[in-house]
Amino acid sequence: MEEKSQVQLDSHIFNTTSSSSQYYPLNVMISRSIKGWRPEPGYPFKCGIEIHTQLKTKHKLFSLSKNSPGAAPNTCASYFDFGLPGTIPKLNPEALLLALRAAVALKSDISSISSFDRKHYFYMDQPLGYQITQHYQPLAKNGHLSLVPRLDDVEEAKTIHVEQIQLEQDTAKLNYNAYDGTVDIDHNRANVPLIEMVTKPDFSHLSELRAFVKKYISLMTHLGVCSGDMENGALRCDVNVSVAGGNRVEIKNLGSTSEIIAAAKYEYARQVQLLKHGKTPVEQETRSWDGTKTIRTRSKEDAIDYRYFPDVELPRIRLHPSIGKDLSQTLPELPEQLIQQLCEEPFLLEVKHARFLVENPDLYNYYKNLHHIIVDKHKLSYKVVNNWIIHEFIGAFNKLDIPVDVSVIDTEKLASLIIMVSEKKISITSAKLLLTQILQSPEDRELSIPDLIDAYDLGAVNDIHGDDLKEAIKEVCSEVIDSHPDVVTKIRNGKTKSINFLIGRAMKETQGKVDSKEFEKMFKKLIG
């Protein structure tokens, strides 16, 4: 199942679609939620993962065809991609560089010599009759990615070891037509460059598996290695699950984080049931995921003999021993480092908010610029910037159900609005309304904040001061109290949140020109 495409903040952050399934007489319900999940005593969970990552190159791995995922079918395919006789592969150096960047980021040992091999099988998605991969001498080995409780939502620190990283070509895409039973083959994906990253079976909890996948995707996207678009197949995963040291079961072609977690959780429960109640042991086999349960596709006895042998048309890759060290010096700061920085002074963001900004580079840069203007130049509190970006700015886009677009209002203009609120030239309520109007109206984006305030008559009350202002506020509050005695009774009986209703009515009466805090103080004084 696909994850929700739009990420909401605060209490809705990183919500995923949930589902459940039933298996065997025990009626075990499997949901995508892992809150409170624990392996059963005596049945330890053991898991490894293989992630196939499409590289974000201009051209394909062994041809000059464009690597364009959104193109019309079969418009980005050369003679070699179609598997025509007489065509010769030539390695794309850009793909090699991106694969090396990924290997360095995962702290892997780069092989000084690596080579390509042919993996033979016959299927519609492989026009050559074999896949070019790296079976005998992969590009990199012995890497790792560390998970920490504060940043990765795991219970304890854990290092996940990467067994190897290999460079290989993707297959063609099969599109099944349920109406007439035909299959269309799109060769645009054939020969698209991939890296296959294989971990050791180090996962002992589903939270570790989820954290690793999210962190890996964030890392590859941040480095420009991959688009990170799982929905369109930029990353595809296979997981290997075993229980209590028994045979492992591979679940192939999982296309989202929620699918990975649901499939692994279901498969663990299935194996535990077999061990508890079955007369036969868990078989070593390959299974697929149908959205509710895993389905057997082939057993160990049915395993394909791929007849690997070296590809004589491609020379070995020979790299200088210092290539890993040299490349590491060219990498930007990694997501974990940036998140850590945003959680410390002078920013002091929550981890979930810092991660959201880092995973959206345009928004990250926007926040840093706004922070510089508001905090460094105008000496306002960091809390002001954090609240405006996380709750007001992103929140306004979410309320309108439109993607966040930082180009709608530049940082100088948003800073101007924030500063005018701090100087009490406009109330916070009016400022929110004005921001929403700017997002909705392209014409208003051309005007300055002061001009917009004048145009919509949103300026704070400036012609009444001191005791006169207090008296005016008291009069409005008294009228609201008289009009809503039932709400006042609720407040006096302990339902203090009901005061927000009264504040809202008062704000409406004054068209948002008076600060809501002033009304709150007065209501509390009058109600007692």
From Swiss-Prot:
Question: GO biological process annotations for this chain's record?
Answer: glutaminyl-tRNAGln biosynthesis via transamidation; mitochondrial translation
The UniProt entry, under SMART domains, shows: GatB_Yqey
Please list the reactions this protein catalyses: L-glutamyl-tRNA(Gln) + L-glutamine + ATP + H2O = L-glutaminyl-tRNA(Gln) + L-glutamate + ADP + phosphate + H(+)
Give GO cellular component annotations, separated by semicolons: glutamyl-tRNA(Gln) amidotransferase complex; mitochondrion
Task: Name the residues that span the membrane.
Answer: none
Keywords in alphabetical order: ATP-binding, Ligase, Mitochondrion, Nucleotide-binding, Protein biosynthesis
State where the protein is found: Mitochondrion
Q: What else is known?
A: This protein may be expected to contain an N-terminal transit peptide but none has been predicted.
Write out the function statement from the record.
Answer: Allows the formation of correctly charged Gln-tRNA(Gln) through the transamidation of misacylated Glu-tRNA(Gln) in the mitochondria. The reaction takes place in the presence of glutamine and ATP through an activated gamma-phospho-Glu-tRNA(Gln).
Recorded protein name is: Glutamyl-tRNA(Gln) amidotransferase subunit B, mitochondrial
Q: Can you name the source organism?
A: Clavispora lusitaniae (strain ATCC 42720) (Yeast)
Q: What is the lineage of its organism?
A: Eukaryota, Fungi, Dikarya, Ascomycota, Saccharomycotina
